[in-house]
Amino acid sequence: MGEQRAAADSTRDDGDRAGGGGNGESVTTVVVAGACNLGIALAKAVAGAVSGSSAMLSEAAHSFADTVTEVLLFLSLKRSTRPADAAHPLGHGRERYLWALLASFATFVGGAVFSVHDGVHTLRYGEELGSPALSYLILAVAFVLESVSLSRTVRQLRGETSRLAVSGYRYLRRTSDTAVKAVFLEDSAALVGLLLAFGGLLGAQLTGDPLWDGLASVLIGALLAWVAYVLARDNASLLIGRSLPARDERAITDTLNAQPRVVRVLDLVTSVYGPEDVLVAAKVDFADLATAAEVEAACDQAERAVRRAVPAVTRVYLDPTPPRP
């Protein structure tokens, strides 16, 4: 080690995998949501065609968009687990955020734009409403199925928030597992959308005025646009490269500073590649060590300590650097 530089890079074994809920659970959550959404979308489309309801057709578009989203999220989870290669030495972890970003576009275009357009058309030109009986039945069944899908996601979220000792809001705001976040937001939006569609149908039925149905459709579109914005913002941030939360960075800094051969951490950089894939690079002022072997041992000891403190860390690069005068 002629340049007084040490780099410690390793991949965790199974015993260290405590940094996230695991890809398997996220895949199951996405598959359950996708299957529910596809069945619901077909039923809503039939009900919308029979009743002539703009809100029901908007809900059908909503569910079809959610189904496309789940397919893209499934691809993101599968492709991001491919091992590192010569062209991608840090792996393919961030590919999950590319597919998830495309999924947010599907939600916006396939759900929000269609719903707002159909709602505005109804508000301007009206519509002929048929019997809403089938629509009410489909809405009730869809509410049950969406609740089942959401309950599965909530169970996963509770497990993660309990393990990490954080609130649900904080976890959803900062999590790098955007697939689970997407399913949670979409299922929650779906339940709200069903209530809006029910209100629009009921208002149109009681008053004979399709304005209520068109207004419900526009509100559903606005809700989907908000979901798409939140998911696009988060995935774009992670795709560009986002650091660990400040609490985790403080834990890493404190862990390094606590090592017997470390004087202090001069600089620390973290970068998230996935829920269980984080890179750490730091300039560290080590106590004067006489040999390269001693530097290597100090770096190895510090790396192991960092990975114990924050199990999501997969790569640690330490640069022995003297303090600047």
Predicted regions and their residues:
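Alpha-helical transmembrane segments and adjacent TM-loop junctions that form the membrane-embedded core
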Residues: 2-5, 13, 93-325
